[in-house]
């Protein structure tokens, strides 16, 4: 950027704009809208709306956390309720998340905001209408719990910025609850976004698997026939010695990497992908070996039309699949539009 352009952006164009209330998720839409259609198509980049993010994170973990909070609120005895709120806050602070195709960070940012809102509810239970005297350690949840991998260097910067904005905004909400100013230095906290090719990296070097609770995201949408040579090579490096791997869509790589990473852990995963992963050859080529290795589907959103908040929306149909390797006694759920159906088992056709 020339000095003239920088001055135009920072001063003339932004002179009357209040940045304090900007939605961090808007950054994702801005980033995607700067890409030309060919770049977006070849990279399979599609921004995820808040609504679609919650289709992933709500059944993966957020619904359960909300239910637990409501149970704490219902406790009649003040001391017991306060103690449970403290323990709940520590639980939130102990959760760790990975988005291995994080793009501009919308999954991580929205998850951080959702956790901080729950934490603020717990803080309300602890302090009531009192003014906090000791504000040194009120907030436990941090952006350091959120890890991402992204191949595009500019998207990495956008993701870090979005997390910092979210951190600042949620800090203000906490200050309103405790009626006190909290020490906060923006950009001081560390955002764990790693620039690199997630399909060639050892995810354990990004975040140790014994520390991780959840994997989530919206990996690139690139059909088997549309992959470039580099993407094809990446796919074959993930599906070593698999039959008919060349017929799989690019997104299948993240299913395989996640399934491998979850072995011998309690990690749970949920991914958005084109509905091709639950149709035709993918059922035999992807899911049969995954099921044989111990993977099972915990919940699924059947085919829905993709909508995002960016211009030039992706014209695709998607599914969301939650899966894990560890034993899971919870009821399995299939979502169709706004209807939820319980199931004993969910197969690859959903």
List the model feature ranges, each with a label:
Residues 51-52, 109, 116, 156, ...:
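Signature of N6-adenine DNA methyltransferases within the class I
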Residues 10-13, 29, 79-80, 127-131, ...:
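Short amphipathic alpha-helical surface micro-motifs
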Residues 186, 193-194:
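AMP-binding/adenylate-forming catalytic domain of the ANL superfamily
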Residues 1-114, 145, 149-158, 162, ...:
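Preference for the N-terminal adenyl/adenosyl cofactor-binding alpha/beta module
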Residues 68-93, 115-144, 167-188:
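Flexible phosphate/Mg2+-sensing switch loops adjacent to catalytic phosphate-binding sites
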Residues 44-45, 130, 134, 207, ...:
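Pocket-edge positions in alpha/beta enzyme catalytic cores
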């Amino acid at each position: 950027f020339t000095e003239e352009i920088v001055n135009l952006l920072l001063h003339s164009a932004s002179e009357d704009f209040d940045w304090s209330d900007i939605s961090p998720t808007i950054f994702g839409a801005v980033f995607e809208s700067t890409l030309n259609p060919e770049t977006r198509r070849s990279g399979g980049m599609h921004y995820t709306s808040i609504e679609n993010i919650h289709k992933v994170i709500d059944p993966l973990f957020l619904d359960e956390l909300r239910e637990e909070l409501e149970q704490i609120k219902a406790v009649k005895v003040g001391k017991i309720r306060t103690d449970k709120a403290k323990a709940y806050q520590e639980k939130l602070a102990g959760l760790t998340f990975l988005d291995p195709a994080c793009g501009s960070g919308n999954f991580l940012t929205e998850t951080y905001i959702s956790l901080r809102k729950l934490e603020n509810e717990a803080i309300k239970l602890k302090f009531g209408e009192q003014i906090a005297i000791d504000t040194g350690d009120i907030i436990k949840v941090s952006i350091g719990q959120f890890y991402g991998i992204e191949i595009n260097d500019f998207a990495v910067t956008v993701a870090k910025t979005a997390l910092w904005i979210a951190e600042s905004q949620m800090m203000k909400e906490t200050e309103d609850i405790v009626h006190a100013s909290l020490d906060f230095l923006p950009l001081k906290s560390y955002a764990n976004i790693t620039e690199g090719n997630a399909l060639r990296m050892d995810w354990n070097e990004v975040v140790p698997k014994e520390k991780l609770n959840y994997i989530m995201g919206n990996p690139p949408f690139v059909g088997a026939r549309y992959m470039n040579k580099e993407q094809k090579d990446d796919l074959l490096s993930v599906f070593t010695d698999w039959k008919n791997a060349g017929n799989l869509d690019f997104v299948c790589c993240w299913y395989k990497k996640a399934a491998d990473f979850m072995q011998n852990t309690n990690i749970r995963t949920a991914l958005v992908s084109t509905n091709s992963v639950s149709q035709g050859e993918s059922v035999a080529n992807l899911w049969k070996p995954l099921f044989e290795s111990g993977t099972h589907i915990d919940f699924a959103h059947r085919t829905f039309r993709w909508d995002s908040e960016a211009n030039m929306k992706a014209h695709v149909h998607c599914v969301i699949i939650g899966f894990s390797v560890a034993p899971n006694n919870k009821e399995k759920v299939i979502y169709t539009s706004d209807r939820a159906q319980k199931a004993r088992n969910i197969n690859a056709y959903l």
